[in-house]
Amino acid sequence: MKHTLALLAPLLGLGLGLALSQLAAGATDCKFLGPAEHLTFTPAARARWLAPRVRAPGLLDSLYGTVRRFLSVVQLNPFPSELVKALLNELASVKVNEVVRYEAGYVVCAVIAGLYLLLVPTAGLCFCCCRCHRRCGGRVKTEHKALACERAALMVFLLLTTLLLLIGVVCAFVTNQRTHEQMGPSIEAMPETLLSLWGLVSDVPQELQAVAQQFSLPQEQVSEELDGVGVSIGSAIHTQLRSSVYPLLAAVGSLGQVLQVSVHHLQTLNATVVELQAGQQDLEPAIREHRDRLLELLQEARCQGDCAGALSWARTLELGADFSQVPSVDHVLHQLKGVPEANFSSMVQEENSTFNALPALAAMQTSSVVQELKKAVAQQPEGVRTLAEGFPGLEAASRWAQALQEVEESSRPYLQEVQRYETYRWIVGCVLCSVVLFVVLCNLLGLNLGIWGLSARDDPSHPEAKGEAGARFLMAGVGLSFLFAAPLILLVFATFLVGGNVQTLVCQSWENGELFEFADTPGNLPPSMNLSQLLGLRKNISIHQAYQQCKEGAALWTVLQLNDSYDLEEHLDINQYTNKLRQELQSLKVDTQSLDLLSSAARRDLEALQSSGLQRIHYPDFLVQIQRPVVKTSMEQLAQELQGLAQAQDNSVLGQRLQEEAQGLRNLHQEKVVPQQSLVAKLNLSVRALESSAPNLQLETSDVLANVTYLKGELPAWAARILRNVSECFLAREMGYFSQYVAWVREEVTQRIATCQPLSGALDNSRVILCDMMADPWNAFWFCLAWCTFFLIPSIIFAVKTSKYFRPIRKRLSSTSSEETQLFHIPRVTSLKL
């Protein structure tokens, strides 16, 4: 039973392994290949990208916002498309009234500036003449009760006005310097922005060539992994079939052991039976002689004692088992002659070694196909090879370069003039801001000296020169204000007119898209300024659409009008290349015929066991004889009984003969019966072993032979199915490397090499340079300077008024004065009454 159970377990494992192998062979599991490598490609795009320009947030942002809101109030009219069209195409057709109507807000500001320019210097001239004739200014004539309140109010108003002037002039200084600092770099950034677009089209073929050359990275990776594909295939076959092969080989080995043991027991059984039969032939006459003599002796009348009991024992002295009655096994031994012919242990070990060597065997068998695959991988797909040659950018590149060169050459003189005039503006701005600052200082010094003089006026020992000096400082500030009022208002209006129109006409319309709409409308731009033609845009794409598409990362060939249509996906189509690799992979084959599983000698042994009829032997017949004693009567007990009877006899001759018989029985038992009993025990062991294994042995042998035959027949199909699955996994893995390359090329070309995004970036940077870097500080400067200019008027008024109170007051008697001025009261003499 133990052998049977030990054999059934591998057979059950074999059945389960066969089912699992079929499932594993039908399913594609690519985990055994491990994770794919991540390829690292070298960027091929040149560094022509400009960093996006953004004005850093600062304290002046709120000032810039205030100026923009002020300009939006000044200019309420929409973008003057017709007026700009006339200015660009036919300057003589421009009507003045249309310009005035559009610039109505600026005209109002010009009127205000004109009035300021006329009235303030005129007032200053009149004030100067009046002062020369001592008609204006001067000092307070008389002291009255409200004098202190008036003086304090004027001083407070003058101080507040001066502080407002100080704030304005500080902001004017800061914005003037900021404008000057940003004007130079901004002007230099314009050519830099144009140069960044120079190679936008012309550099594309060289960069595409560099991209195509990096196809070698996936090629090298695939070629490297092809070196191990044979081992991978063999390992996969080994892994998926070992659940079937190992149990089957274990079952074959176990069955071989059972076969060897069974044949040994059968041979032992046959030899033992022969010996037992021969022993019985020798034992039977001897027992019969002893029985006859004992019957004769025990039946004599001279026999004394329990002769009757001994006589009954002697009558049963005969053979118990008759081994001539057991069935013959000669025909079975004849069938198993020479079995086992094979060494099952070494055969199973050899088959296991052959099965475990499948990876190396597969590598050897696939080496020639792998070399052909490497040759196929080394070839470059036609689309990738012509990636750069197919880009039709020569004519577009020359047209693009010519347009950029014309723009750069035409703009360079203007930029130089702008930079030169900016220097003049900065110098004039610094001078005028310094004048305003000097006015502020005069006001502050005048106020300080005046207050000091007022505090010392009650002390007769202190002269009133301090108050007089304070008044003179205030009048000096007034004189400077009148003197520089005209240059200030002229600078303010000139910078206001330029900067305001740049902001409202260009920057504002640029931000809301009206400038793009104007450029896209046919006929608005002269032929020499046709941007669509200069940029080489497609006919069905407007400038605004091109800008939006470029901002979203569109490719050049979707925006520019190239010679031929360029289809990147067509060049990246490597299906023909991969199909060839797939065909080459399908030619991979692994021969598993070297795995016999069962040698011919072992098969003959199992077939002989199967047809031997070992299970048809009637083993109960053997057990019947084995269970019987060799001699029915216990010869030792009978001999002991005879020994006692011999001693009880009076007749010495009878007693002597009984002793001789007792000793004879003992000798016969030791010489014949005991060996027979040993042979019976040996026979019992073999019969029991064969009885337990023989009934199922034929079925087990049939199952093993059937499983070996089935697995041997299905092994090539299973191996081919596993090979196909492994090939598909390997192909998918290798195609993943080419997919990485295609994805990288698509991203590199569309987002970095052949993208028109630098064009939108250049436009955005140009807007930031013009509007945020130049126009905002420029407009903030004139706004702050205008602040100072208009606050000079209240400064003049309050300074003139306040200076009067800082000069000494002329004291004189008055008839209407109070009694404090009447030092003496002399009573008049009246008439006396007696």
UniProtKB/Swiss-Prot annotation:
Gene Ontology biological process terms from the UniProt entry: negative regulation of caveolin-mediated endocytosis; negative regulation of pinocytosis; positive regulation of cell projection organization; positive regulation of protein phosphorylation; regulation of GTPase activity
Top-level taxon of the source organism: Eukaryota
- The reply to whether Mitochondrion figures as a keyword in the UniProt entry is no
Query: What is the reported tissue distribution?
Result: Present in saliva within small membrane particles (at protein level). Expressed in kidney, prostate, trachea, esophagus, salivary gland, thyroid gland, mammary gland adrenal gland, placenta, stomach, spinal cord and liver. In submucosal tumor, expressed in spindle-shaped or stellate stromal cells. Expressed in prostate cancer cell lines.
**Membrane topology per record:** Multi-pass membrane protein
User: So where does this one cross the membrane?
Assistant: 107-127, 154-174, 427-447, 473-493, 780-800
Which InterPro entries does the UniProt record give? Prominin (IPR008795)
- Family label: Belongs to the prominin family.
Report the protein name in the record.
Prominin-2
* Provenance organism: Homo sapiens (Human)
